[in-house]
Amino acid sequence: MSLLRRPWVLVVGLLLIMSYVGAECEEEEKEYPSRYPIAYFEWENVKIPMTICLWLIGASIAKIIFNLIPHLNELFPDSALLIMIGLIIGIIFKLIGVNKNAFFLESEVFMLYLLPPLVFDAGYFMPARQFFDNFGSILCFAMIGTSFNIVAIALSLWAISLTGLFSVETPLMHMLLFGSVAADVDPVAVIVIFEELKVNEVLFIAVFGESLLNDGVAVVLYRMFLTFSEIGTENLITSDYINGGVSFLVVAFGGIGIGLLFAFLTSLVTRFARDEEVKVLNSVFILILPYTCYLCGELFGLSSIMAIVFCGAAMRQYCRENVDPDTVKATESFIKVLSLASETVIFVFLGLSTVSSNHHWDTSFIVLTVVFCLIYRTLGVVVMCYFLNKYRLNKYTKVDQFIMAYGGLRGAIAYGLVVAIPDFIPGKNMFVTSCIIVIYFTVFLQGITLKPIAEFLQVEKKNVHSKNMIEHIYSELIDTTMAGMEDIAGFKGHHWIRDSWNALNNNYLRPILVNKNNMKEMDKTKLVRKYKHLVDEDAKKIARGDLNSNMVFTKALIEHTRSRTNTMIDGVSSTSKIDFTKHMKENFGVTVYDDHSTVPMTPTHLFQETTEVEYSVRSEINDNDGFENDGYESDESGSFHERV
């Protein structure tokens, strides 16, 4: 009985029952009734969607239970826990004799259905300013660093294979194919851990961007080496190698191009879908068109990962301006739900597939693969940072370099690629086994130890300080000044690039892609718009705090406002006085009387005068953020005290 009370046992049991029912029912033959039944059990009609729903429910419940167990989430990453659950279920299935094909994750299912929500979520919510400010460094890590890792791992393993140490004889082209799998860094596993660490923005965006684009580069090279293997090494000629190199650039940057094209199309569609009857379709366009972009990338042999990443990053700005805020909020929440569900199912199936895959164990090959992955990952990061630091203002420290090298976790994408290797490759089963061990090593050992190591090395944390209005203004001023200085010096750096992009965006792209009415509202006065946004943010912060601590300041502010109001309103026409009084009342909660009189500043009147804006902000917070006065409530006198 004590065993049944353990949450992880219940999770395994739930997923086991769901999977076993799906596996057994698919083998049952259809029986014809001899009498008319009261009810039917038509499993075959709902087998596929029901199995998907059961897996999603079971895996999601597993994640909830993990978060309820004390200290479990602090010690193990979610990815490691989900893999363990899948591994346990897979072992049980094997012991009871369930057909392994019933719980094997096909590469087509992974690449076409589970992967797109993950990469779209990463691209759509990508911190665009930091990403494009560091785009040159990220591109170097992703393209040069990944290519170096692939070639170095492959050449090292191939050179050792010439000694006859490995049990399967593998040519160089097949080793390059496996190298493209082993060098692939999984953005899902990396991003989750680094978000928990709250590392500084420079380090986070370097790891985030590199892992995101690394997938696209690795997949492009994987397909190139796979095509070379299908042609046959002995049949390759010089033009094939030249075409392969050109194809690498065409596929990678073609994927970016098709992503930008679909971002343009999505923004254009949402611009015209503004009528009440059709604007509900905006959510459909925001979700379906990027997925269509991914499929078009697959259709034309381009990098579908880069396509959907850049589609999400480029369309977000325009879609948010075209679509009403409630629809945007609901759509973005649904994107997060899809991403979380895909991530959960992938890692559970990764554990299951450990048992269901065909394996070939070669200790020497596996150990050397792990060692070479660690060595060349570290070497690539150190060498790239050495050259990049010569041209960077914010340089990568030695601690940053260590965390970047140690944080190169492998995951689901590497597994999806290795199981997609054709059966005619002699070392496929050895590659699958080695890839799974590399994933386990990085997710479990490196993933578990990354947080304590980062704390021990005192990695610089992210600055959680929220900028106020004057800081935003100074930041904009510095950007504009730096762009002007670069222009005067004749140096075209990233400030000049950003300034040129803003000019192109404001003069040409936004008039085409953004609804004119929305653009007029947005462009009335940029300073006023920025000021209003920051005032709203400051008001929310004040509302979340104890109002009593702000009472003295609020009283002085109202006295100053009334004094200025009495001065400003003199000599103004009666119509203007009415408009001005209404404006002050609606926007600032300040009542201006015809005789310029003031309300006695008793605590009750002061509270009523000063909390009009705060109450509206509190209502907004309650509606949107689930905020409930931050643990405070007001009594009849109008003062706040801590809720008991």
From Swiss-Prot:
Intramembrane region coordinates: 7-27, 52-72, 402-422
Biological process terms in GO annotation: determination of adult lifespan; lipid storage; nematode larval development; positive regulation of fatty acid transport; positive regulation of growth rate; positive regulation of multicellular organism growth; potassium ion transmembrane transport; regulation of intracellular pH
Gene3D superfamilies: 6.10.140.1330
Consequence of gene disruption: RNAi-mediated knockdown of the protein causes worms to become extremely lean and transparent. Slower progression through the larval stages, in particular the L1 and L2 stages. Increase in average life span, decreased brood size and loss of fat storage granules in the intestine leading to decreased opacity. Reduced rate of pharyngeal pumping, reduced size of proton pulses inside the cells, increased intracellular acidification, reduced uptake of fatty acids, and doubling of the defecation period.
Any Pfam family the entry gives: Na_H_Exchanger
Ranges facing Cytoplasmic side: 1-6, 28-51, 73-78, 129-137, 195-201, 266-294, 355-364, 451-644
Tissue: Expressed uniformly in the intestinal epithelial cells.
GO CC terms, sorted: apical plasma membrane; plasma membrane
Superkingdom, taxonomy of origin: Eukaryota
Protein name as catalogued: Na(+)/H(+) exchanger protein 2
Organism ancestry: Eukaryota, Metazoa, Ecdysozoa, Nematoda, Chromadorea
